[in-house]
Every structure is written in structure tokens, then in C-alpha cells.
Amino acid sequence: MNSPNIHKHILSIIGLWRFICQIFRKLDGLAEEIQRSQPPVELWRKFIYCTSLTGSVIGSVDHMQSQDFDQIVSPVSVAHFSQYKLNALLIKHLEAIGFTIRNEGLNHRHLAEREILMGHTCTSVEPTDNFINVTTSSVTEGNHIENQIPCRFLVGADGAGSTVRNLVGIELRGEKDIQKLVSVHFLSRELGRYLMYEKPGMLFFIFNPGAIGVLVAHDLKQGEFILQMPFYPPQQMFEDFTSETCKKLIFKLVGHELADINVVDIKPWVMHAEVAEKYLACDNRIILAGDAAHRFPPAGGFGMNTGIQDAHNLAWKLAAVIKGIAPMSILPTYEMERRPIALFNTDLSIQNFQAAMAVPAALGLDPATANSVHQVINNTVGSILPSTVQKTLLDGIFSLGRAQLSDFVLNENNPLGSSRLAKVRRIFEEGKSLQLQFPAEDLGFRYREGALVPEIDSEGAPIKPEPPMGRRREYIPSADPGSRLPHMNVRVLSEVKKEVIISTLDLISRDKVEFLLIIAPIDSSYRLAHVVLKVANEHNILVKVCVMWPNGLVNEDARTKTSLAPWENYVDVVEVRQPSNSSSWWDICKMTHRGAILVRPDDHIAWRVKSAVVGDVTVEMKKVFSAILGLL
């Protein structure tokens, strides 16, 4: 695992989607701790476009809507939480459940159970017939130490520059080198206080004749910021961005000097939009996840959120193989399911990045033009003129372009400025600027093939996903195979606690490879449940049955005990309908109560029947589990 001294700003996450917060609800209160620790939503719900942080506002976009705060489609809402803070919380929770975090080397011993090594870098991988021998390097007290770690599986979740990916020769496909940027991590409580009371927001797009940049407000209360600025090598070099130079640029963007500014770190980085050509190598024993498998523009928080989705999909499949529940053939379904999502999110993040460029383009600063000018200089005079002259030429052209942002031009009394400001307003009104939330892609993404029984259309073809829109679409709950199980509050029918209300998502085990069968309390569904439990038991598969009682019609005495005997792994629940949504569970799922839903350990629907199983139920369920787990 990489060093705990994680660079805090390069590609730091600024938004945790609801799907991710739902996952974290199962990790011993992690979601609740994030909700408590994040800044108040009023401090981060807006993106602000301005001429300087203390100057005039060109416009702002509020990215939170009323439905983002209710619990109709999700038991939790989105969160604003930096990646390095999340890493610290994850380590804290791992230690709380018995894991040991170590920074020193192994000293020729084996890696112990529940032991995590920090500060170790993978330097080589050597597959053998039985294991993968991984060589790691670390530095302890100034000494360079190598360790040999044999492992059955190696998951390369080692970032965008993945060593594991490079060692096994997996190529990335997509759009490379979209933009080169400098990221400046700095602190200023003075600026934080001002923005907190005068212009609270998450992102600030700043355009003025002196400088252009995007400021990420990670924590206004603490005064922690990340400034992102494009740069154009070789005329502009990273070495030019010294601490003093960055301070001067920050002051131009703020509108005045800051007395307490502290530049913590300055890093260059390159924006890409790429997905690995494959996710598995070496007989499916080396697996890529997270940024190692895909690199997105940092527009919309797709990188970290997609990476956590990868881990959530992979974890139960690896556990199923290790526990002997499923054969190795289930592992390719990880790539079958996750890679199409990464490709979709790549397209969506590119569209969102292009939307981010719409405002500067409307103001007369089309980034495509800047890139073209830079390319012309490189391809024509680059080999003739001295580097200092090239730099002066490029800086002069860019300064001339930024002059269009002067108060003389950019005002309502200037016909050109008025026209440009009107274009910007239309962009905001039509929702065509950079978006923060994508509810349909957050909760509504669906696996089309893999560890599931897919549904086909009336012509016998698999149902295809809608193309990315680049704009906010609302999430519509679905019980289609491959979809995430819809959320609904339910009351657990228990003789001990009669008022325990949970989400349907809480019915799935958080620490076992266990499937969930949801049925209504009717005879045909009980018979189906008997068969499912019997077939699962024959294959060492855990299944819990959830009997969904309709709201207001539950017979408290007519429990499932006698109907499912001798099986005991079941739970009776009753719908808890919201005042703003009176739909029944089966209405939400667009099914009749005679249907049934089989849910995987990662909360995704593996199989469903809309009304009743036709034919031999035992044969059908054997086919279902074979399709899901790859059983022979």
C-alpha cells in the first residue's frame, strides 16, 4: 500500500456520491462519521464564477435540489469530503476492527493476517503455478528494504500511474494528455473566513486579466484550498511555479494580498480520459481496480466514486472464490461489469469537462483556441526561436486574451461584454455548465452482463443503456437485473423490537457472501423460497429470505416461521411508506407481488421473476445460480 503521506490535492475527491455513502453505512458508522465531519451543505452546494474572489460575481450554480436531501430514493445523501481525510478515516476504522497498520518492512517474515503495510511500493510481480510473488520496497530509518510477499491474488489499486498495470503490460485506451495543470495546495484562514460569510461555495472559477484558475474550497472553516491552473510546456515549465510565484498568482485571483497564506505543496499533473484495455491478467489472478483501471478528468468526482464501486463489485467475488463458493470463472465477470461502467463514465466526465469550458469560451477565452495557439508555436517557431522568446510570445498572446476580462470590456454597458454575459447566463439557466451531481449515474447504473441473469427485449436482444447526456438526470428506481436494489424504509417484524426501521439495503449482509431473496407472503412465493434455499444449500451458498408484507395489511401473528420451516434464515418486514411517496414496494420495482427478486452480496439484483416461475422451479433455480456464480 502506498505511503500514508498521501498527496492531498492531486485528484482529491470533492464529492462522495450517494451510492458510496450507502456502502459506507455498512462500515461501522463510517457514513455517519463522514456526515458529521463534512462542512455544512450551505458552504459547498454552489459553484461560483467571478472576476476575483473579492470582486464581482459573474454567476453561480446551486447544485443541490430538494430531492437531494430527502430519503425517498436513498437513506443517505451525497457528502463533501476530501480523499486524504477519507483515507485517514478508513485507516481508523480498520484499526478499530482489529487490523494492524505498519510502516516498517517485514524483516523476512510472512505478512500476518489483518496486517496492512503502508509506505511499500510494488517493484515486481512473478506469477508461479500456485502464487504470485510480489516484491515490495520500502525505506525504514534511511535503509532501503525489499520484501517478498507470496499471494494468491494481487489487486492493483495503486493509482493512475499503476506500477502493477505497467508490470503486467496492460495498456490504457482513450484520450491522453488532455490538459497539463499545476495544483497548489495552500492554507489561509483569512480567505476561508471571507468566503464562508460572503461567497460560500465548493468551486470558484476565476477569470481576470491577471490570472485564470479554479479554486477548490476543501474546508472554508480551516481555510484549506487547492488552486488548479493550466500551464503549457515547454514555454511554461513547472519549475517556474515557485512558492513566491504561486502566492502572487493567488493574490491576483483573490483581489488582494493575504497576510496568512501558507503554500503547502505544488505539484504538476496531467489530465487523461483513459480506461485499461483489460482488468485481469495472469490467469485472472492479477486484477486492476480504481485509478489503476481508469483515469478521468476531475469533473464530477467520477474517479474516486467509480473506484470504490470497483472494489465493492470485486470484494464479494474474490471472497466467493477464496471461500470455495464460486470457481475462478466468476472473476472475469468483474471486468464484464465494471469496464463498461468505466467507459460510460469516461464519456460522461469528458462531457462534463467540456461543459466546464463553456463559460470561459462564452467570455472569449476558448480553451481550445489556447491549445491551438500553443500547438502552432510548438509546430512552427518552436524549433527556430530561443525558448525565452517562445515564452515571451506565448505569455503575450495569453495576456492579450485575458485582457478581454477587464472591467472595461466585461460589463453590461459594453455591447460585446453584455452579449458575452448573456451567453453565460443562458449556459447556467440551461444547465450546460459543469455539473456536480449525476443521480441517474450515481444510483441508476446497471450491469448488462456478468454475474447475473440478464433480461432481453421483445426481439431477443439485450437491453442497451442510454448514452451519457452530460447533464443531470434523475434516478428512477429499478429492479431490472444488474440494477442496484431500490431503497425503501421497512419495519422489521420482531417479537423483541417492533419499531426497528431499516432500509431495504440493510437487509443485505455487510460481512458475508450471502444472497437475499425478496418475496411477498403468498403460498407460491413461499414454495419458490423453499426451492431457492434447498438449491443454495446444496452448493454451499448462503441465502436469506426477506418476506415483504404490505403496508397496513400485515398479520402480526401470521409470521413466516411455519411457512418456511425448517429453514430459519429469513426476516419479516413491512413497508413504511413516505407521505411524499405512497407507492408499494412492488410498485417501486414495477413488478407484481407474485414476483421475486434475488439480490447479490453487493446489493445488485442478480435475477428476478416478474410474476411466477414457469416450469420446473428446481431446474430454473439451478440455472440461475449457475449463471450467477459460474457453477457447473
Predicted regions span which residues?
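Conserved mid-domain beta->alpha element of the FAD-binding
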Residues: 90, 156, 263, 270-351, ...
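C-terminal helical "tail/cap" subdomain of flavin- and related membrane-associated enzymes
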Residues: 319-476, 509-514, 530-538, 630
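Conserved FAD-binding catalytic core of PHBH/FMO-like flavoproteins
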Residues: 92, 114, 133, 139-141, ...
